[in-house]
């Protein structure tokens, strides 16, 4: 079994639990995922099966989410699963939210949440946070927010639904918290759904149930060329033999990383200097 899988992770379980379930269904150990989703979050979890795991790092890294947040509250985890407190601040107006979102577009600096898996001095931040040792100098990261569109705002209940398209490494919880701080009312994340990741959409995602079979997984597999945005180089018999041995061979192609195809099947990832191709990861 070889390829990618677009899994709709339900809320309430970890991304690793999805992998464990797939291993049980398929009997295959070589399964991995890209872009961890917190237990609270649901939606698209890109999964690689078999030697497709060698290609996980080459999946497109941009993502899109729909997040539901509530103003008038604060939390140490920036979501409803943490220690939540009411701020008793006046109700936030839509115009304030719109102004705050302007500052969260394009390339921005973002500080990861204290409860996150980011490393800090050899430890995960969440480990320090659980020990009550939250650093006050967590380094910021540059991220890109391509879109933050208001889908709905319930003024009475102070609940905002927002669509966010962003780069790798973006913490939606931080976006929520920062917007809460901008309005001075505080805000916590209530729900999070990833609607797109690695060229996979939530409309096409499969849900894993107790009835899901190995054949169901097999029929849902996605070919690497459909989700990885790299040029494809077609090979002849001679090139194929070179690839099997990991040998460099002469062939004009685009410069950079390329996917190698033989008989309409992706067999390797390679690097090209324009004239010669060197296999990097053989997938057979």
Protein language model regions, located:
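Structural signature of FAD isoalloxazine-binding scaffolds in flavoprotein oxidoreductases
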Residues: 56-71, 135-149
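Extended alpha-helical targeting/anchoring segments
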Residues: 116, 120-140, 144
């Amino acid at each position: 079994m070889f390829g990618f899988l677009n899994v709709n992770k339900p809320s309430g379980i970890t991304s690793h639990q999805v992998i464990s379930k797939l291993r049980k269904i398929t009997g295959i150990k070589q399964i991995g995922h890209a872009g961890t989703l917190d237990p609270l979050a649901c939606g698209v979890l890109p999964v690689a099966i078999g030697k497709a795991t060698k290609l996980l790092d080459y999946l497109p890294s941009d993502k899109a989410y729909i997040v539901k947040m509530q103003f008038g509250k604060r939390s140490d985890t920036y979501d409803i699963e943490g220690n939540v407190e009411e701020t008793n601040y006046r109700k936030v107006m839509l115009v304030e939210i719109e102004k705050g979102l302007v500052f969260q577009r394009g390339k921005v600096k973002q500080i990861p949440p204290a409860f996150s898996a980011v490393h800090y001095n050899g430890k995960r931040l969440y480990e320090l946070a659980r020990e009550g040792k939250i650093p006050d100098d967590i380094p910021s990261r540059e991220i890109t927010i391509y879109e933050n569109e208001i889908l709905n705002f319930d003024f009475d209940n102070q609940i905002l639904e927002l669509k966010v398209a962003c780069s790798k490494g973006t913490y939606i919880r931080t976006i929520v918290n920062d917007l809460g701080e901008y309005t001075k009312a505080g805000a916590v994340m209530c729900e999070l759904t990833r609607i797109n990741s690695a060229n996979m959409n939530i409309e096409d995602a499969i849900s894993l149930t107790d009835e899901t079979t190995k054949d169901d997984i097999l029929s849902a597999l996605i070919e690497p060329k459909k989700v990885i945005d790299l040029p494809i180089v077609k090979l002849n018999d001679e090139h194929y033999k070179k690839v099997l041995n990991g040998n460099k061979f002469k062939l004009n192609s685009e410069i950079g990383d390329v996917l190698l195809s033989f008989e309409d099947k992706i067999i390797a990832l390679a690097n090209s200097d324009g004239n010669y191709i060197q296999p990097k990861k053989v997938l057979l």
